[in-house]
Amino acid sequence: MAPYWIEKLGISKSELGNVLFFLLISLGIFMFLVGRWQKKLGFSKIISLGILLNAFGLFCLYWVKSPLGLLSWAFLIGMASCFVYIPALTVVQRAFLERKGLVSGIVNMVFGLSAAIIAPIFRLLLQKWGYENMILLLLGLTLGFGLLASSLIKEPKETKLMQSLRGFSLRPKEALKTSSFWLIWSIWALQGAAGISMVILSVPFGLSLGLGMKEAVFLLSSFNIANGLSRLISGFLSDMLGRKPVMGLSFLVSGLCYFLLPQGFSFAGTSLLCLGIGFAFGTLFSVSAPLVSDCFGLEHFGAIFGLVFTAYGFLAGLLGPSFSGYLLDLSGDYQYVFYYLGTFSMISSLLMAFLKKPKP
C-alpha cells in the first residue's frame, strides 16, 4: 500500500516510516496491558474484541484522506493486533508445553505468511476494484472469519503433566530485575528495528534499482514469505537445538544480508538477501516467545512478554522505519541505511551469547 499512499495522500518517505512507528508505539503500549487483561477476561473474549477493533480500523481507513488520519489508523490497528496476538500465543504454549517452540512458530507463521499472501492480492484488488471497495471487502472478511475463529478458543485444561512441566515463574517486577530480561529487551529493540524496516524499504528500494512494480513487490513478498516460513522452521529447530543458537545465527545472517544489499546484485540475488533478512525477523518472533517462557515461566508470560515488546513498540520503530526514512530523505542513498540496519543485526547476534536463564 506504500506506493498508493505516497501518490494519493502525498506523504513523504519519512512520513511513511512514521506510519509503522505509530503502529509499533501502539504495540508497545497495549501488548503489556492485554497480557494482564487476558487473565481476567479470558482468551476468547479478548480475541473477539481484537477482531472488532480491527474491523473498526478498516472502517476508519475507508475515510482517511490525510497523513494524520493514516497515523491514527496505524495506532488503532496496532492496538487491535495486541488483542489477537498475545492471547493466541499464550494459549498454545500452555496447551503444548513440550513443543512451545513449534506451536509458537505455527501461530507466528500465520501472522507472518498472511502478509506475504496478501501483498500481491492487495495489488490486484487495488487495480481491479479500487481502494474503497477493497477496504469494504476486507472489513467483511475480518468480521466473518475473525469472530467465528475467536468463538472456538478455549482455556487449556490443567493436567498433572502440565503442572510438572510448568516449573518456576517470575512476576513481572521480578523479571525486570534480571539481566536476562534487559538483554532480550535490547535484542528486540535492535533486531526488531532491522527487521521491520524492510517492510517499508523493500518496494521503494526495488523501484530505485529500476525494477518494475511487480518485481519490486516480489522483494517484499520474498521478505514476507521467509518471515512467515522461518517462524515455523526456527520454532521447530529451537525445540531441538536450543533458542540461543537458532536466534544468534539467524541474526548474523541478517546482518550479512544487509551489508550485501547495496552491492548491486541481480534481481534473484537481491530477492535472496531480502529472504535472509525476513528469515531472521520471523525467528525473532517465533523463538522469543518460548525463550521468554523458558526464562521467566508461563504464569505471567503475557505481561512479561508485553514488557519485552515495549522495546519493539517504543524503540524499534524509532530506530528502524522512522530514522531510516529520515536518513534516506537526507542522503538519498540506501547504502547508508542498510549498513546502519545491518549493524543492529550484528549486535543482536552478539548479545545472544551473553543471555542466561535466571536462577530460581
Placement of each model-derived feature along the sequence:
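Extracytoplasmic gate region of multi-pass secondary transporters
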Residues: 1-5, 179-236, 320, 324
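Helix-to-loop junctions at the C-terminal end of transmembrane segments
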Residues: 30-43, 231-242, 328-329
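Structural signature of the two symmetry-related core transmembrane helices
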Residues: 45-59, 245-259
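Intracellular juxtamembrane helix-capping segments at the cytosolic ends
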Residues: 83-96, 283-296
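Helix-loop-helix hairpin linking two adjacent transmembrane segments in secondary transporters
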Residues: 107-154
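Flexible cytoplasmic inter-helical loops of multi-pass small-molecule transporters
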Residues: 154-170
